[in-house]
Amino acid sequence: MSFCVLIPARLASTRLPRKVLLDVGGIPMIEQVRRRALESGAAQVVVAADHPEVVDCIRSYGGEALLTAAEHVCGTERLAEAARLLGLADDAIIVNLQGDEPGMTPALLHATAQLLLDHPQRQMATAAVPITHWDELADPHAVKLVLDAEGCARYFSRAPIPWDRSHFPLSSGQTLPQTPGIWWRHLGLYAYRNAFLQDYAAWSASPLEVIESLEQMRALERGVQIAVYCAAEAPAAGVDTAADLDRVRDLFP
């Protein structure tokens, strides 16, 4: 059994308009993302777009793309619609790769999907990297997670968790206590089984999801075990601003 990668892509981005079609290394960003997915070993890679212009772009490079509804409020809803349009089986493993992450490493995509291939009882998987400095742990834009003994997420938060009562808070620039496997930053990469994805996308927002502004909390609050692949280092961050775009372009001279 293999996996597929679906790439939700919005042309109507707010902070950086039309970013998925902006040039990165001589081709549109969304095509760079698709090429990273193709290198992951996925059996199928499909871009799920909100506009015909994105669909036409991908098809001009010989790729597979679908036009999905424009009114989806999140990428998960777009992903679920694309899976239905493709007629994917209930047990199909789907990796959700954002259309603004041309620096994603194919190995990380494969490893996250492999968690579901190796653990048939799991319905959802994600990834994380170690946090070593206080500034990152204290940053509310860096989402933290706590793992249980089975390698599944117990909680996600923008707060610095777990809180080391003996040492915290630290000063800016300080490294965290040398306790391996304690502090983790969540990476916004997910894999799902299709039947679960369809249910998950239809669930209403949960209380903790609203408080933390973290969509994955709706799964935890319903008792879903989210398997976590612990990577050694993070891929290049996604593109939200013009400064991000300049940084990513340096990776593709």
From Swiss-Prot:
Cysteine pairings via disulfide bonds: none
One GO BP annotation of this record: lipopolysaccharide biosynthetic process
Enzyme Commission number, as recorded: 2.7.7.38
Entry's transmembrane regions: none
Pfam families: CTP_transf_3 (PF02348)
Molecular function terms, GO-annotated: 3-deoxy-manno-octulosonate cytidylyltransferase activity
Enzyme class: transferase
Principal localisation: cytoplasm
GO cellular component, one term: cytosol
CDD domains in the cross-refs: CMP-KDO-Synthetase (cd02517)
Catalytic activity: 3-deoxy-alpha-D-manno-oct-2-ulosonate + CTP = CMP-3-deoxy-beta-D-manno-octulosonate + diphosphate
Keyword Protease among UniProt keywords: no
InterPro entries: Cytidylyl_trans (IPR003329), KdsB (IPR004528), Nucleotide-diphossugar_trans (IPR029044)
Pathway assignment: Nucleotide-sugar biosynthesis; CMP-3-deoxy-D-manno-octulosonate biosynthesis; CMP-3-deoxy-D-manno-octulosonate from 3-deoxy-D-manno-octulosonate and CTP: step 1/1; Bacterial outer membrane biogenesis; lipopolysaccharide biosynthesis
Keywords: Cytoplasm, Lipopolysaccharide biosynthesis, Nucleotidyltransferase, Transferase
Localization per record: Cytoplasm
Function summary: Activates KDO (a required 8-carbon sugar) for incorporation into bacterial lipopolysaccharide in Gram-negative bacteria.
Family per similarity comment: Belongs to the KdsB family.
HAMAP family in the record: KdsB
UniProt-recorded name of the protein: 3-deoxy-manno-octulosonate cytidylyltransferase
Organism: Acidithiobacillus ferrooxidans (strain ATCC 23270 / DSM 14882 / CIP 104768 / NCIMB 8455) (Ferrobacillus ferrooxidans (strain ATCC 23270))
Organism placement in taxonomy: Bacteria, Pseudomonadati, Pseudomonadota, Acidithiobacillia, Acidithiobacillales
Gene expressing this chain: kdsB
